[in-house]
Structures are given as C-alpha cells and as structure tokens.
C-alpha cells in the first residue's frame, strides 16, 4: 500500500508478482485516518485477501492493519512489533490513529482471540486499562 511514495526508490518488490494499492491521492490518512479516507481505503482493499504479507508504507499508516484484520473471519491472534502498544483511547470517535488501532481491533473484532505486543516498554504495557491486561 503506497500512501507516500515510499516504494519509488525501493527495489525489493520490482520484478516480483505483487499487487500495489495506490493511496497517495487519498487525503486524511497521514498518522490519522478520517471516516471518508477509511471508506476509500476499504474500497481499494476490497479485492484483496487478508492472507499474505502486506507492506503498509511507513509507521504513519500502520493503523491500516485494522482494516486488514477486519477482513479475517476466523479466530486469530495478532502479533504487533512496535515500541508502543497502540492501545490508547481515540481522541475523536471518527478518527483512527497509529496510537489507537490495536484497541479498536480488540473492541470491535469478534474473531480476535489474543494480542501479543513485542517491543513496547513494560511501563507502557502496565499503563494499559486493566480490561486489556489478559488480552
């Protein structure tokens, strides 16, 4: 998924059988995703299955992982490699951010069984709301 042009100078994908989702023309996506942008992104993702490896631009867009997990219709566990747990409450209901997407998946996806966060500081994990401690 290309939101910023990050892949233009990259070679790892060239000559391979890959599908690219062009998203540079979608406003309202950098670090935060508004409702209109989410609608357009979901439409562009619609033809693709959740299975596989998905390159999601830079860390400014890793909230897109929620849209991929929304497509999973069987029980699953989510492993997140990040320095932050990304489980903060959203400041605005109609915006998703890099800081709240894991919480939104936990709150809305009935197939999600467990989340494992690798790399976040222990103090950030301990600061999570107690309802999320076992998940």
Q: Where in this protein do the model-derived segments appear?
A:
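Conserved alpha-helical scaffold segments that buttress catalytic/binding sites
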Residues: 1-135
């Amino acid at each position: 998924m290309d939101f910023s042009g990050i892949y233009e100078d990259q070679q790892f994908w060239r000559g391979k059988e890959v599908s690219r989702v062009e998203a540079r023309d979608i406003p309202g996506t950098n670090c935060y995703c508004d409702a209109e942008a989410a609608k357009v992104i979901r439409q562009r993702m619609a033809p693709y299955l959740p299975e596989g490896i998905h390159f999601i631009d830079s860390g400014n867009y890793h909230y897109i992982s929620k849209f991929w997990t929304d497509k999973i219709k069987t029980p699953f566990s989510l492993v997140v490699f990040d320095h932050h747990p990304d489980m903060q409450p959203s400041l605005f209901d109609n915006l998703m951010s890099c800081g709240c997407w894991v919480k939104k998946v936990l709150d809305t996806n009935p197939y999600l069984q467990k989340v494992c966060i690798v790399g976040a500081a222990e103090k950030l994990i301990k600061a999570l709301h107690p309802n999320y401690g076992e998940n």
